[in-house]
Amino acid sequence: MSKINLLLLCGGGSAEHDISLLSANYFETSLAKSEQFNVLRVVLDKFGQYQTAAGDDCELTNNREIRFRDESKAPWPVDYVIPCIHGYPGETGDIQSYFNLIQLPYFGCESEASSNCFNKITAKMWFSALGIPNTPYIFLNQYDDEAIAQTQAALEKWGSIFVKAASQGSSVGCYKVDEASKVLGVLKDAFGYAPYVIVEKTIKARELEVAVYEYQGEVIATLPGEIICDSNTFYTFDEKYAKSSKARTDVVAQNVPTDISDQIRAYAIKAFKGMKLRHLSRIDFFLTADNEILLNEINTFPGSTPISMFPKMLQNHGHDFTQYLSLVINSQLAAK
């Protein structure tokens, strides 16, 4: 049986470029444990240029091959691609649209599902349409006096708010606001990251995460894990990835009643199926002191860094990541 030429595409143009490279390390290590794959790792830089790990400039053509700038090197045909890209253009659905156009099979959610989840406003509309509770919010489409007034009114009503760029990941362009004097500056900063902004009520709650993925034709939802931060600390981009981070994680959240855990997992599967996700996701929830469950967000290509929850939760559920990848890839290619 011939090996599968697998393109591991990583990097991208977002603030999460470097995190994507760390996740790609995990994928590369996992794929190396299987003899099925010839893996070519290619980095997509912030300017849309492709380069191999060996430093060769190249491009992915519509003939489904990697063509090198050095024409003495033969083109490398691509059978399958893993777009290990957090943020733009991976989780936004843009790169998937190109793969669809050139009929190149790929790992992960399809373009529309990715786009729907990445935009926080669209995602919340979907959550509500599916009957899944989520945090109270308003959304804004431009930085003007009306937006400032709406945000100040939300702060007065809710006491504390989060102002978030609607189309960013990993808490990029996301700010906690407790004082009216901070509204103008925070709104301006958030609109600097995206043309749409969402304002959410601050929820004092535990932050629980569920790995949801397809395995042998079944949608699996793991037991919820938990992100634990210091009191009143927001789990920012830096708090997630800085070496000095005081946040810690539990692969299985402690002291969550069984019925609450079951309901969280049921909501996670409902969101996965209802929004037509594919292969993998990490779905994040809030759990309040009185056991109110609120869906926070969906990550359609969750991180796989040494501190990331998705691979840990999958493994804790009894599944091997290499075998999981092999099953997904072989099943998809067999269905072509």
UniProtKB/Swiss-Prot annotation:
In Swiss-Prot or TrEMBL terms, this protein is called: D-alanine--D-alanine ligase
Is Magnesium found in the keyword set? yes
Record EC number: 6.3.2.4
What does this protein's UniProt record list under function?
A: Cell wall formation.
The Gene Ontology biological process annotation of the record reads: cell wall organization; peptidoglycan biosynthetic process; regulation of cell shape
Q: Which GO terms describe its cellular component?
A: cytosol
Q: Identify its protein family.
A: Belongs to the D-alanine--D-alanine ligase family.
Describe cofactor binding as the record notes it.
Binds 2 magnesium or manganese ions per subunit.
Name of encoding gene = ddl
Q: Which organism is it from?
A: Shewanella oneidensis (strain ATCC 700550 / JCM 31522 / CIP 106686 / LMG 19005 / NCIMB 14063 / MR-1)
